[in-house]
């Protein structure tokens, strides 16, 4: 993906970061799934496909080598904290997390640019998230 984006003249590539133990619902964690690695629980599968520090260090190194910047969307507070170890140009909040006040305010407090994804959100949810982003939870209430 990085190579294709660099050749195409893109400025950034974006990944996603999740803590599967937080993001996988309890009722799905032990469900057995067929995966490319055989049968395993859904939680084990999600851990297998999730990038860790080694992979993100390589992404960081390779993007620098290719002259392209990168970022990632954190799906939980652990992931935001993890991503803060990198010099990311922005943080993109996934649309599924647009109603997560704690995550949006914490992203705001990093001092980095924050992009809010709004797919499938109501206008009220967008306005509320925007207020959290602008006012850090201290601003106008709806």
Model-predicted regions and their roles:
Residues 1-18, 86-87:
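Catalytic domains of carbohydrate-active enzymes, especially glycoside hydrolases
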Residues 11-50:
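Glycine-rich, proline-tolerant flexible connector loops at the mouths of alpha/beta enzymes
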Residues 13-15, 70-72, 89-93, 114-116, ...:
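Hydrophobic faces of well-ordered beta-strands that scaffold small-molecule active sites
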Residues 23-28, 53-56, 79-81, 93-111, ...:
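Active-site-adjacent beta->alpha loops and helix N-cap segments on the catalytic face
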Residues 35-96, 100:
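Active-site beta->alpha loop and helix N-cap motifs at the rims of alpha/beta catalytic domains
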Residues 65-66, 135-141:
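Short helix-capping segments at alpha-helix termini
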